[in-house]
Amino acid sequence: ITDLSFVKINQVSNANPQQKNYKWGTVELTKWTSYKGLELEGLLYKPEDFDPNKKYPLMVYFYETYSQDLHNHYVPKPTASIVYATEYVSNDYIVFIPDIKYVDGHPANSAFDCIVSGTDHIAKNSWIDTNRMALQGQSWGGYQTAMLVTMTDKYCCAMAGAPVSNMTSAYGGIRWGSGLSRMFQ
């Protein structure tokens, strides 16, 4: 509660005490040019006590596009495999979420061009520990993670969550929720 001047503020509740357990960090929109000349954007999260003289591990997470979510708030919570930036920045990671612009018929090359060029762009910063860069994707992003580790050794580890690792067998697979085969979607 406050008066009309907003000088004196009195807190009357503490609805989310768990928030004190997080270092909320900052997020910024970063831009770069891909290897193939595409102008790209992505989100870059840093710890709230970010020190440019320190080296930070980098977590690269992706799924199509996220830059439109620059001002969205995601409540930290346990999840099957989605990277919540707040969890990582609270543990002194930098989190990079690049957008992917797909060229029809070339998903692998599109993902490589956008994700790896974005990683290179971020890795130019002296505060990135290039020996501790990781990659994570879920579902379609998991498929791309499994594919990317065959195309570059830039990442020291990778986690492919719920990936399709065999497109032929996945074509006849049953979709979660709908019960329909993928071939009918």
Q: Across the structure, where does each feature detected by a protein language model lie?
A:
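Active-site-proximal cap/loop segments of hydrolase catalytic domains
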Residues: 61, 75-185
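A flexible loop/linker signature enriched in serine peptidases of the S9 family
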Residues: 1, 70-72, 104
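Non-catalytic accessory segments flanking enzyme active sites
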Residues: 1-54, 78, 83, 90
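Active-site glycine-rich loops that stabilize anionic/oxyanionic intermediates
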Residues: 56, 63-68
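Glycine/Thr-rich phosphate-binding loops of Rossmann-like dinucleotide-binding domains
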Residues: 68-70, 168
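Flexible, active-site-proximal loop/turn residues at the rims of small-molecule/cofactor binding pockets
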Residues: 48-49, 65-66, 164
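Conserved helix-loop functional segments at active or binding sites
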Residues: 14, 18, 50, 68, ...
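Short coil/turn segments at beta-strand junctions that form active-site/ligand-binding loops
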Residues: 54-56, 131-132
